[in-house]
Amino acid sequence: MQVDIGAILTGYAQGYFLMADEETGSLAWYGTEQHALIPLDERFHCPRSLRPLVRGSCFQVRINGAFEQVVEGCAARPQTWISSELKQIYLALHQAGFAHSFETWQGDTLAGGILGIALGAAFIGESMFYRIPNASKVALVKLVEHLRERGFRLFDAQLMNPHLARFGAFLMDGRDYQELLQQCLRIPCRFD
């Protein structure tokens, strides 16, 4: 399959995201009137119960250590929007330096991870998974720390859910989001 990286990046740069229909597998662009953002400032909240795991040595963090395994982990659900075509797109974006995996490990075991796309100072979180309890939560906290250190200004989680709300996620309307995204696209940041 030939992937038009430029066209894919243009879609993300306009605030859209790709999803496959769970039943047919057909791929389409989706937009939302409000984007769920993970704050990269003092509004970010690490739940108290998670703090010992974040400070401890239970999980080690790696970047892009097992990208394909993270994609597979994110897709391994009874119903998934990550089709085989979308997996190929993520792999092409990864090979081009845009898609990344942020992983938690226990020894030699991949415990969990987050899949996302970095464009300028924006990180667009596509999906996350865990195999060991709390691994994806620790990955989220450590990813926020990493994005702060690298100068990122936007962490787009796309759609709100109660899990993200526990970390301080908030909704931003489309117009404000577009303005922030366009600013971030002009700021060079290196993810890895």
From Swiss-Prot:
Its main location: cytoplasm. It is found in: Cytoplasm. Keywords: Acyltransferase, Cytoplasm, Transferase. GO terms for biological process: protein catabolic process. SUPFAM superfamilies: Acyl-CoA N-acyltransferases (Nat) (SSF55729). The keyword Membrane does not apply. GO terms for molecular function: leucyl-tRNA--protein transferase activity. The keyword Plastid does not apply. Its EC number is 2.3.2.6. It catalyses: N-terminal L-lysyl-[protein] + L-leucyl-tRNA(Leu) = N-terminal L-leucyl-L-lysyl-[protein] + tRNA(Leu) + H(+); N-terminal L-arginyl-[protein] + L-leucyl-tRNA(Leu) = N-terminal L-leucyl-L-arginyl-[protein] + tRNA(Leu) + H(+); L-phenylalanyl-tRNA(Phe) + an N-terminal L-alpha-aminoacyl-[protein] = an N-terminal L-phenylalanyl-L-alpha-aminoacyl-[protein] + tRNA(Phe). Pfam families: Leu_Phe_trans. GO terms for cellular component: cytoplasm. Functions in the N-end rule pathway of protein degradation where it conjugates Leu, Phe and, less efficiently, Met from aminoacyl-tRNAs to the N-termini of proteins containing an N-terminal arginine or lysine. Belongs to the L/F-transferase family. This is Leucyl/phenylalanyl-tRNA--protein transferase. It comes from Synechococcus sp. (strain JA-3-3Ab). The gene is aat.
